[in-house]
């Protein structure tokens, strides 16, 4: 069976402060490309890594617009729950208090659960929890499926699975190479990641949206997975890069410099201590740090 693998969606009708154009047209163009890829390749389902919306509270217009786009794909849309889909990083509130809960109720082909049983594959999900990337007794348990199936197993995790190092803690594919899944699909981090270790694949397509100025030149991609042959094809998603602006005022540059000096700290406790002592660091800069820390 052929599946389309999609990174964090971050759907919104509002452009970021770095853009002067409308992000809506870009989203709609990308969904059209998804429909074309589904038709051309005989795709039977889409699996997404979460962060369906950019924030947990969205307008009715935004919710209905995304519902229409998901239903237009014509195949099951199966997703994890990301940190942007939750309130206060609490997984239990998504159904009753968030826009994702409303979207689920009105979108016929949207599937959200801990496990999805496909025709010849099983998808298990580790939705976002604050301890998703925490090591326990030498293992990163969130990257191991609790499913006991005989068919092709895809484990979807909304967590920082990254090749190499970052200024904050991440999980390297080599650290979870003995996972019981055939394929680990991760989100949260917005740049593509791919490694194959033995017969197992570890993949993050990267975010479906280019939300920040630093991310403006990244080419969006999706994965085409054939579960019958365990083969992955990475496909680019063409789009209009949009119109971006650079904030060049002195105040912004000073805050940017302070943040750059501060983020060198890799220990979160030390970092927050430094922030607390630094009177020059404005609230919006602190907020931006946490956005970076949480993959936003």
What are these regions (language model features)?
Residues 1-65, 140-149, 296:
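N-terminal active-site segment of His-dependent metallophosphoesterases
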Residues 5-7, 45-51, 77-84, 111-115, ...:
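Active-site neighborhood of phospho(di)ester-bond hydrolases with catalytic His/Asp-centered motifs
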Residues 15-17, 50-69, 86-106, 125, ...:
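Metal-dependent catalytic neighborhoods of phosphoester/phosphodiester hydrolases
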Residues 65-74, 171-179:
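Catalytic-core regions built around general acid/base machinery
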Residues 166-234:
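Conserved beta-sheet core of the metallophosphoesterase superfamily
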């Amino acid at each position: 069976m052929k599946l389309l693998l999609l990174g964090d969606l971050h759907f919104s009708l509002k452009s970021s402060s770095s853009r002067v154009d409308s992000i809506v047209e870009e989203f709609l163009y990308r969904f059209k490309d998804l429909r074309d890829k589904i038709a051309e390749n005989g795709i039977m389902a889409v699996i997404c890594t979460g962060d369906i919306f950019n924030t947990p509270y969205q307008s009715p217009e935004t919710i209905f617009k995304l519902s229409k786009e998901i239903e237009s794909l014509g195949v099951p849309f199966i997703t994890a729950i990301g940190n942007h889909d939750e309130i206060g990083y609490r997984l239990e509130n998504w159904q009753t208090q968030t826009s994702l809960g409303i979207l689920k109720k009105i979108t016929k082909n949207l599937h959200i659960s801990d496990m999805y049983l496909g025709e010849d594959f099983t998808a298990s999900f580790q939705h976002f929890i604050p301890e998703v990337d925490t090591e326990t007794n030498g293992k990163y348990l969130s990257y191991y499926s609790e499913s006991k199936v005989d068919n092709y197993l895809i484990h979807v995790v909304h967590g920082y699975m990254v090749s190499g190092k970052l200024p904050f803690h991440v999980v390297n594919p080599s650290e979870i190479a003995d996972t019981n899944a055939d394929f680990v699909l991760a989100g949260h981090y917005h740049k593509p990641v791919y490694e194959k270790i033995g017969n197992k694949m570890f993949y993050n397509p990267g975010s479906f949206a280019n939300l920040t100025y630093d991310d403006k030149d990244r080419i969006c991609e999706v994965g085409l997975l054939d579960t019958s042959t365990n083969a992955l094809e990475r496909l680019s998603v063409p789009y209009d890069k949009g119109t971006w602006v650079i904030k060049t005022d002195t105040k912004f540059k000073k805050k940017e410099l302070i943040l750059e000096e501060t983020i060198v700290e890799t220990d979160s406790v030390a970092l927050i201590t430094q922030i607390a002592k630094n009177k020059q660091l404005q609230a919006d800069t602190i907020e931006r740090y946490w956005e970076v820390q949480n993959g936003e």
